[in-house]
C-alpha cells in the first residue's frame, strides 16, 4: 500500500516531455510551472510539449540548462496546472544503501510507469557532457539503483517511500540498452 500511496501522491506532477522525435520525463518542481528534467531530453531544441497524466498537453519553454550536470528546467503556464501539487524534495544527505526507491516516468513513451528497487550504491561518478576541448565532465554524487530505468525515464524523479524526490533518473548502463543493466 505504501507504493500505491506514493504513486497517487506524486504521479500527477510527473510529466512526459516530447521534443521533436525524442521524449523523456520530468517533474513539476514548483507552483510557477517549473519542471525539472535532464538536459539531454531538451538539448536538441525545437518545440517542447509537456503531457500530464490527466491528458493535459501544454507547450513549454526552456528556462535554463546545465549540460555538465545533465539537468534542465523548463516552464509551462502555471495557471493551467494550479490544481497539481508540485513534488517535495528530500535531504539527499540522509540516503542509505539498501533504501527502497521508486522511479516514475515514461519508459519507451509509456507514461506514468512506476518501478521499484533499492539504492545499490551512493557517490558514484557518471560521465556527462563533452566540452569543446573533448574533455568530459563527471557528474558527482550519483545514486546507483536497481530500479528499472529505460529510455524515456530520463528526467523523471527517483523517490523515497515518503514520495520525496531524492534524485533525477538520468541514464542506464547496459550492453543491450534495456533494464538489464545499472540505473542512475
Residue ranges and their predicted role:
Residues 1-184:
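Serine-dependent protease modules
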Amino acid at each position: 500500500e505504501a507504493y500505491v500511496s506514493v504513486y497517487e501522491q506524486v504521479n500527477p506532477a510527473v510529466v512526459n516531455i516530447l521534443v521533436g522525435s525524442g521524449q523523456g520525463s520530468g517533474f513539476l518542481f514548483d507552483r510557477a510551472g517549473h519542471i525539472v528534467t535532464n538536459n539531454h531530453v531538451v538539448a536538441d531544441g525545437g518545440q517542447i510539449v509537456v503531457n500530464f497524466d490527466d491528458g493535459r498537453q501544454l507547450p513549454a519553454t526552456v528556462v535554463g540548462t546545465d549540460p555538465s550536470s545533465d539537468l534542465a528546467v523548463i516552464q509551462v503556464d502555471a495557471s493551467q496546472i494550479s490544481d497539481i501539487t508540485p513534488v517535495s524534495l528530500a535531504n539527499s544527505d540522509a540516503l542509505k544503501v539498501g533504501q527502497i526507491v521508486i522511479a516514475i516516468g515514461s519508459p519507451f513513451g509509456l507514461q506514468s510507469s512506476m518501478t521499484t528497487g533499492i539504492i545499490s550504491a551512493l557517490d558514484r561518478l557518471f560521465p556527462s557532457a563533452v566540452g569543446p576541448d573533448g574533455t568530459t565532465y563527471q557528474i558527482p554524487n550519483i545514486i546507483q539503483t536497481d530500479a528499472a530505468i529505460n529510455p524515456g525515464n530520463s528526467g523523471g524523479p527517483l523517490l523515497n517511500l515518503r514520495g520525496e524526490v531524492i534524485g533525477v533518473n538520468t541514464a542506464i548502463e547496459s550492453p543491450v540498452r534495456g533494464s538489464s543493466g545499472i540505473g542512475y
